[in-house]
Amino acid sequence: TKIADLRSQTTDQLSDELLKLXKEQ
């Protein structure tokens, strides 16, 4: 299902961004 793939992709991207922000601080 494309929707599920998009959701997991978005979640992965958000997790990466959060990790980057956390490391920067």
From Swiss-Prot:
Keyword Ribonucleoprotein: yes
Keyword Ribosomal protein attached: yes
GO cellular component, as recorded: ribonucleoprotein complex; ribosome
Keywords noted in UniProt: Ribonucleoprotein, Ribosomal protein
Gene: rpmC
Domain of life of the source: Bacteria
Family listed: Belongs to the universal ribosomal protein uL29 family.
Name of the protein: Large ribosomal subunit protein uL29
